[in-house]
């Protein structure tokens, strides 16, 4: 499988809308409300903030499987001003889970963050989310945990 990072255009935000609205895909997000409504009128401001004016504090890309010609997920990170850390985000469309895309996406995200000068990448994952194991297999370690989340980190 050949997976490539794609910097989406504004008119391609419908894939992100589809990801966030899909119940199976967003089931991991149950602790924070599940699916996320993301109507088209919000796209431009979000796009300007994340893609155009990222100020090297935000990174966002689609994962494209070139073999099948489909987007399979998204990867991102952003600098959290409250905790003073870079937080990762990866979402794989439910029908593509269990096929290795998350491993590839996580490695591409870490490589991109490192190239952009990020030294440590974190992710706060719901305590009952099975993806914790995947992050640990990909070099993340537990930083701390609460009753709600496990904070994982990887030194890049």
What do these predicted regions represent?
Residues 113-126:
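Conserved GNAT acetyl-CoA-binding A-motif
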Residues 103, 126-144:
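Conserved active-site alpha-helix within GNAT-family acetyltransferase domains
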Residues 16-24, 43-47:
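Hydrophobic alpha-helical core bundles mediating ligand binding, dimerization, or RNAP-core interactions
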Residues 26-37:
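A short gly/proline-enriched turn/hairpin at secondary-structure junctions
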Residues 36-87, 93-95:
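Acetyl-CoA-dependent GNAT
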Residues 127-128, 145-156:
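C-terminal "cap" of GNAT-fold acetyltransferases
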Residues 1-14, 18, 27-29, 141, ...:
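Conserved N-terminal entry element of GNAT/NAT acetyltransferase domains
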Residues 96, 100-108:
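Conserved acetyl-CoA pyrophosphate-binding loop and the N-cap/start of the following alpha-helix
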């Amino acid at each position: 499988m050949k997976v490539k990072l794609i910097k989406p255009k504004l008119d391609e935000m419908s894939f992100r809308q589809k990801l966030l609205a899909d119940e199976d895909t967003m089931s991991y997000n149950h602790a924070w409300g599940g699916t996320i409504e993301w109507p088209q009128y919000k796209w431009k401001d979000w796009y300007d903030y994340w893609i155009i004016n990222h100020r090297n504090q935000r990174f966002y890309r689609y994962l494209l499987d070139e073999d099948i010609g489909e987007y399979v997920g998204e990867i991102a990170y952003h600098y959290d001003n409250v905790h003073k850390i870079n937080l990762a985000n990866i979402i794989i469309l439910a029908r593509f889970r269990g096929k290795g895309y998350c491993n590839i996406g996580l490695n591409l995200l870490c490589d991109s963050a490192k190239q952009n000068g990020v030294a440590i990448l974190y992710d706060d994952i719901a305590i009952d989310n099975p993806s914790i194991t995947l992050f640990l297999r990909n070099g993340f370690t537990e930083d701390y945990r609460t009753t709600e989340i496990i904070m994982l980190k990887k030194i890049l």
